[in-house]
Amino acid sequence: MSAALRFDNIGKVFPGVRALDGISFDVHAGEVHGLMGENGAGKSTLLKILGGEYQPDAGSVLVDGQPVHFSSAAASIAAGIAVIHQELQYVPDLTVAENLLLGRLPNALGWVKKGEAKRHVRERLTAMGVDLDPDAKLGRLSIAQRQMVEICKALMRNARVIALDEPTSSLSHRETEVLFKLVDDLRAQGRALIYISHRMDEIYRLCDACTIFRDGRKIASHESLADVPREQLVAEMVGREISDIYHYAPRALGDVRFSAEGVDGPALREPASFSVRAGEIVGFFGLVGAGRSELMRLVYGADRRRAGELTLDGKRIDVKRTGDAIRHGIVLCPEDRKEEGIIAMASVAENINISCRRHSLRAGLFIDRKTEIETADRFIQRLKIKTPNRRQKIRFLSGGNQQKAILSRWLAEPDLKVVILDEPTRGIDVGAKHEIYDVIYRLAERGCAIVMVSSELPEVLGVSDRIVVMREGRIAGELARAQANEHAVLSLALPQTSVAEAA
């Protein structure tokens, strides 16, 4: 049986980096083919070739046995290919319906038939089991909702080959189950799917076959995962065995370093209070929409607080904007690193130095380039940031390496006291997670107070000294590490269970 999609000896080179080297594998109709590898292994680059964003320097792509060359994304779409990237592509000021039908809006004599467009979109969303308002502006939706729109857009094009790059990274459990059903339905319809994920549970739940990348090369292809243990996939991905990804070790904790009392804002149902000791890692867990990120933005000054007091080392501080927080040694690594974390057109070195630049000014006026170069090189080496050089534009780095650069930005701060990490390992492979946990522990050992927001319950349980659980815009409860387990945390997080019952 000929493959619906074949990659034949694909090669791609960027300045100083061989991103893909001799990649060959097949994807068949009615098959979900998993693609795994560390960040920077070349998975997303391959999808960009499939989607017409990049052209291969060697090899060829075959669809239904015929060689194809996509000079643009439009050419790929016209050939029945749909690629859903980790970096979402949407127009924030347009509605859900307008984004889904962009370029295909029904019209009469040049006038868009909005009623027909909304009706069509509503019918398709209902059929897919997706609960979204067709009139809602994309820019006002959550990241999870925007991701569902991207997935729906591909499905509405009736593509024969669909590639999904970390599609559940921002989805709730219910939304993930909706996606899984869609994938199962598409497989049953005979479509060919590529599914990139770092989550082993998803790979084993969805995929019929799996290919492993490492450093731009194919390490292995498995036609069936039935007899392949998870440990083997991890070893193939990272080139080494990782027995305990979290490697938690108790550490001495100091006095309360930071506290928030009665913090309130539009996204919260009731005022929230919490504290963090010096050297402590407090994990914040909750379902999508629980208000964790919103609470952190209020504390950091990114959004305006209606009420609440912040205390640092026993003294009340006034934080009305992010600059105030940074001056007090409080920093936040945001959930959406593409929009709020990195400066995409700047170099790796500039992204690392942007926050601490005020410390490298000579005579208060001139940037000390020598100091900045030394700082960038030190953190590139210490955090193992994969980049050809410090001058490389950060947008060309993988998600894991971008995240390491953002963490380097704050590690370079000499007066760092409080670090808020919002989904620090989202979309990052198991090897990079291991390294980022090392960074978090290093910050805690420096005496920093760490707040880690995460949707991955095993991560929260594995890394945190204490866990705060949020539910529907309020703090539902708190658990010490010794008391915490999946049942106890989920009992507090799930809407149908009261705090009293969970206790």
UniProtKB/Swiss-Prot annotation:
Membrane topology type: Peripheral membrane protein
InterPro entries for this protein: AAA+_ATPase, ABC_carbohydrate_import_ATPase, ABC_transporter-like_ATP-bd, ABC_transporter-like_CS, P-loop_NTPase
Gene3D superfamilies: P-loop containing nucleotide triphosphate hydrolases
Localization per Swiss-Prot or TrEMBL: Cell inner membrane
GO molecular function: ABC-type L-arabinose transporter activity; ATP binding; ATP hydrolysis activity
Alphabetized Pfam families for the sequence: ABC_tran
Domain of life of the native organism: Bacteria
Keyword Repeat: yes
Residues annotated for ATP binding in this entry: 37-44
Cellular compartments per GO CC: plasma membrane
Top EC category: translocase
Catalytic activity as recorded in UniProt: L-arabinose(out) + ATP + H2O = L-arabinose(in) + ADP + phosphate + H(+)
Family under the similarity heading: Belongs to the ABC transporter superfamily. Arabinose importer (TC 3.A.1.2.2) family.
Protein name: Arabinose import ATP-binding protein AraG 1
Higher taxonomy: Bacteria, Pseudomonadati, Pseudomonadota, Betaproteobacteria, Burkholderiales
UniProt gene name: araG1
